[in-house]
A protein has these predicted regions:
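Glycan-recognition/cleft segments
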Residues: 95-97, 101-108
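Predominantly extracellular/luminal cell-surface or secreted proteins
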Residues: 85-87, 107-111
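N-terminal signal peptide c-region/cleavage motif recognized by signal peptidases
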Residues: 17-20
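Solvent-exposed strand-loop boundary residues in beta-sheet-rich modules
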Residues: 112-114, 169
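Short beta-strand and strand-turn-strand segments in soluble, beta-rich domains
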Residues: 42-43, 117-127
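Bacterial N-terminal signal peptides that target proteins for export
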Residues: 1-9
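N-terminal small/polar-rich segments of proteins
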Residues: 22-98, 128-169
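Polar, enzyme-active/binding microenvironments
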Residues: 12
């Protein structure tokens, strides 16, 4: 009889242990989301006309140079335009570099020197093309054509201006 009680107790203990080892599970779901807003970056390299010679080299020939403005936007950014202001010494619709006492006129163009003036509004805004690979660190460059007109009567000195390039998106 003692053996039967011990066997019964052992069986009961095993049954209880086996029952508690069976775990129940429940599941749920949750949403994952994010949003990507239109965003752009803009950079530009300096434009250096170099030496302007109003007596010989540039007496009848304009001084033409170019630089680049580069824009990188998130994929799907639409209606992106880039404008260039008149600079810190601009007046009316003209751009000028200054040496503090005298001014040297110049202009910036979007298609070629002497073509379409690149401005900050209207027809002078440049509509940016379809953008290349996103996230590759490279943007879409566009050439800025600069021209100092020939035959300007200006004083000796260093002439400078500061242009602000703005990306609208």
């Amino acid at each position: 009889m003692k053996t039967r009680i011990l066997t019964f107790a052992t069986a009961a203990a095993l049954l209880f242990t086996a029952h508690s080892a069976v775990a129940l599970t429940k599941s749920t779901t949750f949403n994952v989301s994010s949003s990507v807003a239109a965003n752009c970056t803009i950079s530009a390299t300096d434009l250096n006309f170099g030496a302007y010679d109003p007596l010989v080299a540039n007496k009848t020939t304009a001084l033409d140079v170019n630089t680049t403005v580069t824009v990188l936007c998130t994929k799907g950014s639409n209606g992106v335009t880039v404008g260039l202001d008149l600079g810190t010494h601009g007046a009316a619709a003209n751009r000028f570099m200054s040496n503090g006492t005298d001014s040297l006129q110049y202009e910036l163009y979007s298609n070629s020197a002497g073509g379409t003036v690149w401005s900050n509004g209207g027809a002078g805004l440049v509509t940016w093309p379809v953008f290349g690979p996103i996230g590759a660190g490279a943007g879409t460059p566009h050439t800025v054509f600069g021209r100092v007109p020939a035959g300007q009567d200006v004083s000796v000195g260093s002439y400078t201006d500061i242009i602000t390039a703005t990306v609208n998106f």
